A protein has these predicted regions:
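Mature extracytoplasmic enzyme cores
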Residues: 1-339
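Mature extracellular/secreted ectodomains of secretory-pathway proteins
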Residues: 343-344
């Protein structure tokens, strides 16, 4: 039958790369934004808009002009993030489980009653409980005995900040404008790869990241009954993992660690707070390896070349399998003749 391309899903992966104008045939910066989403997604939509000073085209996330080109500047996003969330274990009052202890006082949880529609079923009403850890509403996600487990995220209360930031990003004309637009750190955790018409390219590992007090293992649940584990503030834009105009004149982040965006490791993980780098140094995907191979060899890149790179189907590790199988055929020359569908 006819292939329903709207139902083809590629989950958990995105590609983003940019080649500066110095390495392209026509002197234009070329950027790929490939979010690996469905053509008819419930969240992402391809769009083109012109309204007054706003001229933008790309992929929207709901109403937000998410991955965009505005004739002066383009950017792509791929999954990758600083550490922006923490889990707290909080003692609750056994006589009143909606109260929790904080700095030797009982505090009342904030409660909201919400009703959720269920497709094909009856609505469900739940009471949602929150504490006020780190100055933000922090949801109770589990209970065990007299302990409530609470998740605190720096993104809570920042929805309006994100809207304003996306608007300013779409108004930017250079990567320097883009950086200024993002200094409020309202962006969701993402790898941002950007390029402008002047040939500048830039990478940012975006995400509003808390500064934690020392002395705790923040990779696990921490005590949440006093202010000793309250966040001390947030890292600034200047402290975030980023790179501007590398000498290779290209950048790629196909879901790789920040130090594997180039063949030479221009980013040193040790130079950043671990919660900002927040990845295994040297980790790379097969998509990242292939992008490095193709982009490193690209010179006087054309749009046709970029198209070929975007749709390249080479599986970069296949050559090792071919070599191993060729070796096996030499070592065991009669093996194939002895096999059947039942024995392979």
């Amino acid at each position: 039958g006819i292939l329903d391309v709207s139902r083809q899903q590629l989950k958990g992966a995105s590609n983003g790369w940019v080649v500066a104008s110095q390495r392209t045939a026509n002197g234009s910066t070329i950027l790929l934004a490939d979010p690996h989403t469905e053509l008819q997604s419930g969240a992402y939509y391809e769009y083109r808009i012109q309204a007054g000073d706003l001229k933008s085209a790309g992929f929207s996330l709901g109403p937000l002009l998410w991955q965009a080109n505005n004739n002066h500047l383009s950017w792509a996003m791929t999954t990758g993030n600083p550490d922006m969330w923490d889990c707290y274990a909080v003692e609750v009052d056994p006589e009143n489980p909606t109260r929790y202890r904080f700095d030797d006082q009982w505090q009342e949880m904030v409660e909201f009653e919400e009703t959720f529609g269920v497709r094909g079923g009856e609505t469900v009403t739940e009471v949602l409980e929150y504490t006020r850890h780190n100055g933000v509403l922090s949801p109770v996600v589990a209970r065990r005995g007299n302990t409530a487990y609470v998740v605190s995220t720096s993104q809570m209360h920042d929805a309006g900040l994100l809207d304003n930031e996306i608007w300013r990003m779409n108004q930017a004309k250079t990567v320097f404008d883009l950086r200024d637009a993002m200094t409020g750190l309202g962006m969701f955790p993402q790898n941002i790869v950007a390029g402008d018409s002047a040939g500048n390219i830039w990478y940012l590992r975006a995400g509003k990241t808390p500064i934690r007090p020392p002395g705790y293992d923040w990779t696990r649940t921490v005590p949440g009954n006093d202010s000793a584990t309250e966040w001390l503030g947030y890292y600034t834009m200047d402290e975030m993992v980023q790179m501007l105009n590398p000498p290779q004149d290209f950048l790629q982040n196909n879901n790789v660690a920040p130090d594997r965006m180039l063949t030479d490791r221009n980013i040193d993980a040790a130079a950043y707070a671990s919660v900002l780098f927040n990845d295994t140094p040297g980790r790379i995907t097969t998509r990242g390896l292939r992008a490095l191979e193709l982009l490193s060899d690209a010179d006087r890149l054309t749009l046709a070349d970029a198209h070929d790179i975007a749709f390249d189907e080479t599986w970069i590790t296949a050559k090792y399998w071919v070599a191993a199988l060729q070796y096996a055929l030499v070592q065991f020359p009669g093996w194939l003749e002895e096999q059947s569908a039942e024995t392979v």
